[in-house]
UniProtKB/Swiss-Prot annotation:
Disulfide bonds: none annotated. This is ATP phosphoribosyltransferase. It is an enzyme of class 2 (transferase). It comes from Aquifex aeolicus (strain VF5). The gene is hisG. It catalyses: 1-(5-phospho-beta-D-ribosyl)-ATP + diphosphate = 5-phospho-alpha-D-ribose 1-diphosphate + ATP. Keywords: Amino-acid biosynthesis, ATP-binding, Cytoplasm, Glycosyltransferase, Histidine biosynthesis, Nucleotide-binding, Transferase. GO terms for cellular component: cytoplasm. Its main location: cytoplasm. It comes from the Bacteria.
Length: 214
């Protein structure tokens, strides 16, 4: 039996819909207080999205559904098998409209983010010195109260930014959900994992991208 880490929150429903559509599970599993579920001969762990790569890299889970944003931030030693084509959003720098000119002209700024590693690498490549504040909550507050000049965060609809008087200033990248695998599990449970993967690929009518084990 393979074990799969599923992200709680916004990605959960999309992931379950995909598993149902591909015939991997027959009954809908629900997000609730129970954190270990079994369906279709698979054990599912419901975990915080940022914890998915931890469970997979450690071998507690054989597979996991992980946002590409989390993958870039954590850089886990896992195999990235397949772009699932769900959970699309942008990684972007945002701020007050009046700060846009400062963003493009200054060589020293401050940025609040849940993604300090992504932010560091991005601004390093731009040749901009960035004082990075790691926050685990609503980063939109930071430029409003003077903690930082800008934020770097996920943007899905842009509604939260708009409601707080912020705008997207520069796009850093795009993120979708990926299927990742533990390296040892991929070798030891290769048959089961490839069967799981083939069921996704076999019904691949939505243009899902298969990357391979690298």
């Amino acid at each position: 039996m393979i074990k799969v880490a599923l992200p709680k929150g916004r990605l959960f429903e999309e992931t379950v819909d995909l598993l149902l559509k591909r015939g991997i599970i027959e009954k809908r599993i629900e997000e609730g207080r129970k954190l270990i579920l079994e369906e279709g001969g698979i054990t599912f762990f419901l975990v915080k999205p940022s914890d998915v790569p931890v469970y997979v890299e450690s071998g507690v889970s054989d597979l996991g559904v992980c946002g590409y944003d989390v993958y870039l931030e954590k850089k886990p030693s896992v195999y990235r098998l397949m772009d699932l084509g769900i959970g699309f959003c942008r990684i972007a720098v945002a701020g007050k409209p009046e700060s846009e000119e400062k963003y493009f002209s200054s060589t020293h700024i401050s940025v609040a983010t849940k993604y300090p590693n992504i932010a560091y690498e991005f601004f390093k490549k731009k040749g901009v010195k960035a004082d990075i504040y790691y926050l685990n909550g609503s980063v939109e507050l930071a430029p409003l109260v003077g903690l930082s000049d800008f934020i770097l965060d996920l943007v899905q609809t842009g509604r939260t930014l708009k409601e707080n008087g912020l705008i997207v200033i520069e796009e850093v990248g795009k993120s979708t959900a990926w299927l990742i695998a533990n390296k040892d599990s991929f070798r030891i449970k290769n048959g089961q994992i490839m069967e799981f993967l083939s069921r996704l690929v076999q019904h691949n009518k939505d243009g899902l991208q298969v990357q391979g084990s690298s």
